[in-house]
Design a protein with these regions (language model features):
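N-terminal first-folded block
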Residues: 3-43
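Feature captures the catalytic cores and cofactor-binding loops of soluble hydro-lyases/lyases
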Residues: 23, 33-44, 49-110
Length: 110
């Protein structure tokens, strides 16, 4: 499933990055020290954290995309860093739980 497919399933907004990427797995969490050891390459990372530290962790862990839940807005300095580092970021009005259930249903074709 591509990020474009995910965006459509979530009625999310692309903040920056490449929608053609294909994800593999999902990680949900806001504690950055934990995310550094848990987010895997090509995962979707669902969080409400929107500062430059999230982008710094993403440059180390290489998720397919970061999805900001609950209409969280990516801070301007974080957006600039994401663009400079090729990090794909989306924002969604949905809760982290609802994002997970919709992604799961979309993957299963439900």
């Amino acid at each position: 499933m591509t990020i474009r497919d995910v965006r459509e399933a979530l009625s999310a907004t692309l903040v920056c990055g490449d929608e053609a990427k294909v994800f593999d797995g999902v990680y949900v969490g806001d504690l950055l020290s934990r995310a550094m050891s848990r987010v895997q390459c090509n995962n979707l990372w669902i969080t409400i954290m929107s500062n430059t530290n999230v982008i710094a962790v993403a440059t180390l862990t290489e998720p397919c995309a970061i999805i900001l839940a609950e209409d969280v807005v990516l801070q301007p300095d974080a957006k600039k860093s994401a663009e400079e580092n090729g990090i794909t970021v989306l924002t969604s009005p949905l809760s982290a739980y609802e994002i997970c259930t919709r992604v799961d249903r979309a993957e299963k074709g439900i």
